[in-house]
Amino acid sequence: MLYLVRMDVNLPHDMPAAQADDIKAREKAYAQQLQHEGKWQQLYRVVGEYANYSIFDVGSHDELHTLLSGLPLFPYMKIHVTPLAKHPSSIR
């Protein structure tokens, strides 16, 4: 199942830099692991924002929820999920 996911990150302004750096490093490692597994298929930065659009390919809504809630930045994110279906005019 394919999903388009927008993630907006809002770290607290008073979060110590070392804590923020640790969370970001763990986030990067987890995101890259999911990409290597083929579950996080595409990742795009939103220009000028601390946000991204991503394409996930997972087996169920529950699996996606588990993956997203496992992100170290999850407590600081606003997430919008859009399930995708193949378009009848697509040649792919």
Curated annotation (Swiss-Prot):
SUPFAM superfamilies: Dimeric alpha+beta barrel (SSF54909). It comes from the Bacteria. Gene3D superfamilies: Dimeric alpha+beta barrel. It is an enzyme of class 5 (isomerase). Its EC number is 5.3.3.4. Transmembrane segments: none annotated. It catalyses: (S)-muconolactone = (4,5-dihydro-5-oxofuran-2-yl)-acetate. This is Muconolactone Delta-isomerase. The lineage of its organism: Bacteria, Pseudomonadati, Pseudomonadota, Betaproteobacteria, Burkholderiales.
